[in-house]
């Protein structure tokens, strides 16, 4: 068991404090929002030419990142120029003939029956002398047609739109208040009759931390599962007949993984991500992922060994660790990879949530997919075992497959079936929550399944295991159990 503790400590020590919140580097000539990708633009001996605009070389830099939805993400090296430094920029959300729909959060063609849209080529601008004039945009401004963020919102005063003024220098203001650079213009209906150009601001979808009855129920059910797994661990540690067997060691390793994984999930559920450091918000979920994924591959390892038991294969201590160590390293490597990977423009761990973001499908790819692979491997060996049992005469089967191993086989697969049901419920619950836009991994079905998982471990791994039951009877009768201790030379 010391080896498992060492592996956990090594993973913690390998985590590094990586602040992923974006800040502008001082060696870039301007803010990212003021730049445009000019890769492929014509470069003279001195300046560059982009969209018929001459850009001095000191406004050009090589970037190895882009910013999407306010988040900096790595990108291939490319040239960007401060086009808004050369000519004031005006950002329009959608192409000609389209408007940005605030409810559907995308560019759409307006429904028929409304008045025609205002021209994209002209807009009312306040000139330097203070006068307002409808001017053609192209000669005076660099026009960008895009939304700077995935979700945009209108800035209103009460329920009324604010009349923002576009200035000749590209700024937008209202009574001394300057609008953010992260904006785009779109026509919006004013009074259900006329269109008015309105700047929209970035509205990132914030996933707020909630600690309610549902979260506490989930945490309590996880605690029940943890206590159940702890009982399984203690019983298998005390049982001399199980202590040094392959099956006993594997079950103990599995119980440790489940205890640590569920404990970390409970901790993350009850703690606001805003109160955790960036490093903690990356390392803790990575550790939880490692333990949970590793637990499923331990079950696959047990299924493999139970199948080999039909052929009388006995694992030595060296064989056990030669097979088990790569499994641990793969789980550690996978969790480390996920902890520093992006899903779309967001880090998988960190930000609004310190677990998988329920607003996307990252949990299906990085958690449930490897779990499914482990279950498929286990199922494969279960099918092979059943084929072997079916093909053997009843008498020969009893001779070649000892009753102890047969009992382990039945109790293990009973528990595996319960485990599969629990995680199928978790997957289906997430899919339903996602479909109904309930941005959470949790519901009461998931919570109660966690408690059921703990009770299933007690029932199948202790209640249905004949060796454990015999050991508990000897304990109850006050018999000495140490005399049956087996040296750790081979794993049966």
From Swiss-Prot:
Residue ranges that the UniProt entry lists as topological domain Cytoplasmic: 240-245, 304-317, 384-411, 463-492
GO BP terms in the entry: determination of adult lifespan; G protein-coupled receptor signaling pathway; response to starvation
GO cellular component, one term: membrane
Side Extracellular, residues: 22-218, 267-282, 339-362, 433-441
GO molecular function ontology, one term from the record: G protein-coupled receptor activity
Family matches, as InterPro entries: Methusela_ecto_dom_1, Methusela_ecto_dom_2, Methuselah_N_dom, Methuselah_N_sf, Mth_GPCR
Topological category with respect to the lipid bilayer: Multi-pass membrane protein
Name the record gives this protein: Probable G-protein coupled receptor Mth-like 8
Organism of origin: Drosophila melanogaster (Fruit fly)
Taxonomic lineage of the native organism: Eukaryota, Metazoa, Ecdysozoa, Arthropoda, Hexapoda
């Amino acid at each position: 068991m010391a080896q498992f503790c060492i592996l956990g400590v090594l993973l913690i020590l390998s985590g590094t404090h990586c602040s992923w919140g974006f800040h502008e580097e001082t060696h870039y000539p301007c803010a990212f929002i003021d730049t445009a990708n000019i890769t492929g633009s014509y470069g003279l001996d001195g300046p560059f030419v982009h969209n018929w605009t001459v850009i001095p070389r000191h406004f050009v830099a090589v970037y190895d990142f882009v910013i999407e939805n306010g988040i900096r993400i790595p990108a291939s090296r490319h040239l960007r120029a401060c086009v808004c430094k050369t000519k004031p920029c005006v950002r329009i959300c959608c192409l000609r003939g389209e408007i940005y729909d605030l409810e559907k959060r995308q560019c759409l063609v307006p429904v028929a029956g409304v008045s025609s849209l205002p021209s994209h080529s002209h807009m009312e601008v306040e000139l330097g002398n203070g006068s307002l004039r409808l001017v053609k945009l192209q000669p005076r401004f660099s026009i960008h047609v895009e939304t700077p963020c995935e979700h945009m919102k209108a800035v209103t005063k009460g329920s009324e739109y604010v009349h923002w003024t576009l200035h000749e220098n590209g700024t937008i203001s209202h009574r001394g208040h300057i609008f953010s650079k992260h904006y785009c213009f779109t026509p919006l209906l004013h009074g259900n009759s006329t269109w008015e150009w309105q700047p929209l601001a970035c509205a990132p979808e914030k996933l707020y931390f909630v600690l309610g009855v549902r979260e506490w129920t989930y945490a309590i059910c996880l605690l029940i599962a943890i206590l159940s797994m702890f009982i399984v661990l203690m019983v298998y540690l005390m049982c001399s007949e199980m202590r040094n067997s392959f099956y006993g060691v594997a079950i103990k390793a599995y119980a440790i993984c489940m205890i640590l994984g569920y404990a970390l999930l409970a901790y993350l559920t009850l703690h606001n991500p805003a109160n955790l450091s960036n490093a903690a918000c990356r390392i803790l979920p990575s550790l939880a992922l490692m333990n949970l994924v590793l637990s499923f591959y331990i079950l696959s390892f047990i299924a493999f060994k139970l199948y080999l038991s039909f052929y009388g294969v006995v694992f030595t201590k060296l064989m056990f660790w030669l097979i088990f160590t790569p499994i641990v390293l793969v789980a550690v490597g996978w969790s480390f990879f996920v902890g520093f990977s992006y899903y779309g423009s967001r880090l998988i761990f960190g930000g609004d949530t310190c677990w998988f973001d329920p607003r996307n499908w990252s949990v299906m790819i990085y958690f449930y997919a490897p779990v499914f692979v482990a279950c498929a491997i286990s199922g494969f060996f279960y099918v092979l075992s059943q084929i072997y049992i079916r093909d053997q005469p009843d008498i020969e089967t009893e001779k070649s497959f000892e009753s102890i191993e047969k009992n382990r086989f039945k109790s293990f697969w009973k528990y595996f079936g319960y485990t599969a049901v629990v995680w199928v419920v978790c997957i289906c619950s997430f899919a339903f929550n996602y479909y109904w836009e309930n941005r959470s991994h949790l519901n009461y079905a998931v919570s109660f399944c966690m408690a059921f998982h703990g009770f299933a471990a007690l029932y199948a791994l202790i209640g249905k295991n004949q060796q454990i039951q015999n050991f508990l009877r000897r304990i109850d009768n006050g018999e000495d159990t140490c005399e049956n201790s087996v040296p750790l030379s081979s794993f049966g």
